[in-house]
Amino acid sequence: GPLVEAMRAGSLLYIEEINRIPEETLNVLITVMSEGEITVPRLGRILAEPGFQMIAAMNPFDSVGTARISSAVYDRMCRISVAYQSAEDETNIVHRASPASNKQWCAQVVDVVRHTRAHSDLRTGSSVRGAIDTALVAQSLGELRGKDALDPLVGLDAALTSLSGRVKLREGAVRSVEEVITDIWNTVFAAPSENGDVGKVNAPTGATN
């Protein structure tokens, strides 16, 4: 597997969402991290070649479907806290993922997503993936409707589709997720962009498909 290959090659092993790995599986890495070796049935004892390193990522704020990481694992790792990218970096990420999208429009979509992280009605906002999906969905939705992806209604429907499952309401919030996203969209797109366009639209009166 990837672990044995990385050890034999003396290369980097990257583990995504390490806190979603079952504890009994994760504990296999303890000997690898402390002794640089692992014993595999039929393969025997495997030593890590010089240069072998392991990097793992996790979202500490997402507890659904995650497993407890033991203190023994934490004791063998160094931790770096990584914040969100800057608005400019996120815009570049979105535009790179959806090069057909207008870059100024991508910047506004990123602004919408960044607003979700600080909105008083939301306890969890969206990552840059939400902005990427909004841009991609808007392109596809525009083609299906025979409209430009920059059309305000196309953009709003794309945002509702992409963000409504990602953001979480605070307890006691009186508005729906769709209403909050629509409000944020109108707040961002009501302000004239560099080319003077305004993208404010009315809130949907029914469910968005």
Named regions from a protein language model:
Residues 1-209:
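C-terminal regulatory/interaction module of P-loop NTP-utilizing enzymes
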